[in-house]
Amino acid sequence: MAVGKNKGLSKGGKKGGKKKVVDPFSRKDWYDVKAPNMFQTRQIGKTLVNRTQGQRIASDYLKGRVFEVSLADLQKDIDPERSFRKFRLIAEDVQDRNVLCNFHGMDLTTDKYRSMVKKWQTLIEAIVEAKTIDGYLLRVFCIGFTAKDQQSQRKTCYAQQSQVRKIRARMTDIITNEVSGADLKQLVNKLALDSIAKDIEKSCQRIYPLHDVYIRKVKVLKKPRFDVSKLLELHGDGGGKSVEAVVSSEGAVIDRPEGYEPPVQEAV
């Protein structure tokens, strides 16, 4: 016979008793997601993150999140020409309860892209890599379709391969010039207005008439080194926070945003 107390009986309860239910949302905080000042809608939504606990800092889990928003929502416009464009914004910094985002790419909705592909016409696509003035390396995808002549009785409107090569070369030249001659803010404004695609369509009319010319997708391949002052300048008001000057021990002036928290040191 075993000598000792039976812990299960001494507690007077059943093994595996009722556990206290903890609401997981009680450990989370809401943050406002802010778009750059090139868009009319500055607050595009809210996002959740676990509250800061010890070494686990909430802002570290917010940085790098990507938000996909329709251009119609960003510009407060119900124009159908804007609704099928999706802009991707990436969280780069956190100021107080504001998540400051920057441009991370653009794409067309799947239904719009598939509705353009039809029979009896030639699809022409160009893929261009170019760098902006401020150091962003972008890959731009352009798409266009040959248009039928209204006076022609033919069912088809196929272009010759020599014409396709000329149109693709013209697309490449225009996109390269537009991207390399502008900074990121100016380029985003051009993408929102679709001015690059309109220039391509107008320039290629002499080679072969085109229709449904769009910048189909934009990818950000490489970014310059992160600078918080440039991000605050891109947001105008800096997400509601001002920048204050801090004097270091050497006497140099350092610009730090209000509410700046120094990183946690692993060792002293």
From Swiss-Prot:
Disulfide bonds: none annotated. GO terms for molecular function: structural constituent of ribosome. GO terms for cellular component: cytosolic small ribosomal subunit. Residues 1-21 are annotated as: Disordered. It comes from the Eukaryota. Keywords: Cytoplasm, Developmental protein, Differentiation, Oogenesis, Ribonucleoprotein, Ribosomal protein. InterPro entries: Ribosomal_eS1, Ribosomal_eS1_CS, Ribosomal_eS1_euk. The keyword DNA repair does not apply. It comes from Drosophila sechellia. GO terms for biological process: oogenesis; translation. It is found in: Cytoplasm. The keyword Ribonucleoprotein applies. Belongs to the eukaryotic ribosomal protein eS1 family. HAMAP family: Ribosomal_eS1_euk. Essential for oogenesis; required for late follicle cell development. This is Small ribosomal subunit protein eS1. Component of the small ribosomal subunit. Mature ribosomes consist of a small (40S) and a large (60S) subunit. The 40S subunit contains about 33 different proteins and 1 molecule of RNA (18S). The 60S subunit contains about 49 different proteins and 3 molecules of RNA (28S, 5.8S and 5S).
